[in-house]
Amino acid sequence: MTNIRKSHPLMKIVNNAFIDLPAPSNISSWWNFGSLLGICLILQILTGLFLAMHYTSDTTTAFASVTHICRDVNYGWIIRYMHANGASMFFICLYMHVGRGLYYGSYTFLETWNIGVILLFTVMATAFMGYVLPWGQMSFWGATVITNLLSAIPYIGTNLVEWIWGGFSVDKATLTRFFAFHFILPFIIAALAMIHLLFLHETGSNNPTGISSDMDKIPFHPYYTIKDILGALLLILALMMLVLFAPDLLGDPDNYTPANPLNTPPHIKPEWYFLFAYAILRSIPNKLGGVLALVLSILILILMPLLHTSKQRSMMFRPLSQCLFWILVANLLTLTWIGGQPVEHPYIIIGQLASIMYFFLILVLMPTASMIENNLLKW
């Protein structure tokens, strides 16, 4: 008799994806972040669902409804802070996951990589719209500043912005539609994640060496299920430490002031996970140029397979490329710091230099280093 998990139409899919899946025997903890992202997404959908039961997407009551959730709803405070800090954990896992892909050359799986970049954009859009919902000062002004960037698009810009706003400013219509989009997008993300996984399982996972591991596979269960459970426990530990000991550590105090269109906060800045892109946006004194740089800072990931000039896939045995990779990481951390600073000397010039360095590293230095390494190995 055949095993039900191998014969049942639904269980067969689960079996082939999570149980009998042939996995490389040498994948490190950097390969844990895929499953952690799945856990983050499920957690965000569940906490978000319970928040949506008590939230009202009306400009007059949105702020009060969030206060009501924290004060009056049973365990509302923990649900709210798990959702807010869950987003931070989500982005930490996302950036680690992308970094792993860059380091070990996983971008050579073209379909998987491109779906991944689309996923990154979708998650960023969802997080941005979610930040607008509490209708605090930073919610309102963040929404105003970021949506207003679209007015830099020639000819159709102004019409486009007013169409997104649903009026002549960020108002009730904007908040309502942002809530609608914020609710629906995570389900689209879940569908995209399944497609991401579908394409990945066509080729099988990459591994730290970047060499084919077809001759040395092990079943996903129990080896990697237990490893993923450990990762999940550490993720939940980190999240709950944030939620229970420092729930507002990563937030902005301005968002505890209700939105006021007549009073602009002294410093408008997004959540920490967008600061690097915000720094790139601000480093260019031209509006359209800034918007293009902002979009390209993420869209450049699409070009990674084209910029791969090395004869080796992974950076594991490429010291020069490794060095440049970690310089890129340091550069992104610098941009993140600059994005949170006021627009004044010396932060302006540091931001401009870091922005130039970001694109120069990816477009010029890393491909050149790869070619130098090829020559050194006489390949």
From Swiss-Prot:
Lineage: Eukaryota, Metazoa, Chordata, Craniata, Vertebrata
UniProt-recorded name of the protein: Cytochrome b
Topological category with respect to the lipid bilayer: Multi-pass membrane protein
Organism for this UniProt entry: Tetracerus quadricornis (Four-horned antelope)
CC per GO annotation: mitochondrial inner membrane; respiratory chain complex III
MF terms (GO), sorted A to Z: metal ion binding; ubiquinol-cytochrome-c reductase activity
Residues involved in heme b b566 binding: H97, H196
Disulphide bridges: none
InterPro entries named in the record: Cyt_b/b6_C, Cyt_b/b6_C_sf, Cyt_b/b6_N, Cytb/b6-like_sf, Cytochrome_b, Cytochrome_b_C_euk/bac, Cytochrome_b_N_euk/bac, Di-haem_cyt_TM
